[in-house]
Amino acid sequence: MKKTIPVVGMACSACSANIEKKLCSLAGVNSASVSLPGRSALVDFNPDVISLDKMKQEVNNIGYDLVIEADRSVDEIERRAYRLLRRKTLLSWVFALLVMAISMRWIVIGGRNMANQVSLLLALANMIYCGKSFYVTAFKQLKHATANMDSLVAMSTGISFLFSVFNTFWGESVWGSRGIEWHTYYDASVMIITFVLTGRLLEEKAKDSTASSIRQLMGLQPKTARIVQDGKIEEVPISTIEKGDILEVRAGDKIPVDGEVVSAESFMKANAAYVDESMITGEPTPSEKIQGSRVLAGTIPNQGKLRMRALQIGENTALAHIIQMVQEAQNSKAPVQRIIDKLALIFVPVVMGVSVVTFFLWWILGGNVALPHAILSAIAVLVIACPCAMGLATPTALMVGIGKAAQEKVLIKDATALERMRKVNAMVIDKTGTLTIPNKDIDFTKADNLPLEARETLKPYAQEAMQELQDDGVEIYMMSGDKEEAARYWASKAGIKHYKSKVLPQDKENLVRKLQRQGMTVAMVGDGINDTQALALSDVSIAIGRGTDVAMDVAQVTLMGDDLRAIPKAIQLSRRTVSMIKQNLFWAFIYNVVCIPMAAGALYLFGISFQITPMWASALMAFSSVSVVLNSLRLKFMA
């Protein structure tokens, strides 16, 4: 059984990696994939061996929460969490500005001791209320011998606070008596928390935008429906609808479930209504619905009203399947992300080790100010290290890319398919049902006596789509069961150079193998059962949404409508997404490689007296993760 479960409390890639590791270690869990930007876990498990409650308990033990209760609204939980984060961030800025004002002597409170004690109280209040989650999560991580971003924040702020407390009460007697100048660093501990919270607030806002495609799809689901019982019409929650119920849907209403039309009427036609299905199929023209027609949840009658019998409800509707497919795709991981996840598990412990080495080097080599400088350098290293930027680099770009594809009416099943599409340079395409639409009004027993144009029609924009693909360097091979003359005619009509007539299903499979042996990355586009072998064999398999269920089950990519221009769009989107991932990873890697040594004071080795302070380290760390998300969001606005 596969299930997408919302996760609350993740802050960095180490968080998602720890949750994934914990879930995969549980008996009964076959596999788990946790998405940081998606705030969810895709879990394949055996419900006879392990329950959702058990998984929730195990994840809660390491500091996170799985939302499995049906009565808990994920959206409401996330809204509450965001409001709390915003409140803590604003209050933390108040504490930070007060402590900074006291530190800079903009506010004068008695003598030095009094000022330090007031700063102590303000910093402590900030840690207890605004920074509490860092310490709680870090403690839970410590109990399970793991670490994440919260561990780094808790260590850095805890050390700077405790060192400041020591100096507040014993600084003069320990350091002053030896002629060593001493300071407190409450401003550093407060500003670290403030900048990290600010970064997370901005990051949450930005990550929220990466999930907009899912919210748009979920927005197609109405909350209520009109049920017809005993001649009366009553509005009821959609969750109470059962199979076989008769529902009334009026113009402008969203159809609540999948079903069959019982009766329809409109001013244009007495026994028909017209339904806008563009949000599902991409078709701009409303579809005529008469008695016996199938209707889909989320579509909208824009002319007339209809009564329908509910056939598929809840998670079994076509819309629910689309949402589930997009969620699973966004939770899937590209091969490079698997490597990043492994790095994330060791990144934080390595940073802690670098921080300890930095401390001892400065303590040994720092002269009179050895200890204070060693502590500040160690804190700066802890704060500036950012597993978030590396962890967000791939999944945010994938989420936006897969979401953008869904908006273009292209469903991509997993990250591997999206990544592989950019390499496609050969495409095998079935003719009937894919390039052409059979004419439903003809007698096919007499079809041989009819002109080719009368038997079937080239799909709108098919020629344009084929031209775009060929201009992009993709060689297209049309496969047809027709005679040579008919195959040549339709290939010419679509603008395709390579074609083959009188093909059998194994011929398609053989052509795919032949092209692959020539070193080409092959996409197969089909819609029928006879295409499934070739679809399964191809590097990228593309099915037409109006095709058979078997073809769509095998395919990695599904076109929800008949517009073949979606294929070149998807290939271009794949290239842009992979390019964005490379950009994100490059800058995240460069950030850590450059900034960690600068925070440790490496520039002193080259005679440059510059070092990143803990406060600036926290600001840079916050900016690095936000910038990765914002860079990925650029995909949404690319044509």
Task: Map each language-model feature to its residues.
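Conserved ATP-binding TGD loop and adjacent catalytic N/P-domain core of P-type ATPases
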Residues: 17, 38, 412, 422, ...
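Conserved cytosolic catalytic loops of P-type ATPases
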Residues: 4, 26-49, 53, 183-186, ...
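Actuator/coupling domain of P-type ATPases
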Residues: 58-76, 117-119, 123-224, 242, ...
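Juxtamembrane helix-loop transition segments at the membrane interface in multi-pass membrane proteins
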Residues: 139-144, 205-220, 396-415, 633-639
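Conserved catalytic phosphorylation-site environment of P-type ATPases
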Residues: 280, 376, 386-451, 534, ...
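Bilayer-spanning, highly hydrophobic alpha-helical transmembrane segments
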Residues: 90-98, 338-366, 378-386, 391-396, ...
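Flexible metal-binding regulatory segments at protein termini and peripheral loops
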Residues: 1-116, 216, 232-233, 270, ...
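Membrane-embedded alpha-helical bundles of multi-pass transporters
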Residues: 108-111, 143, 162, 404, ...
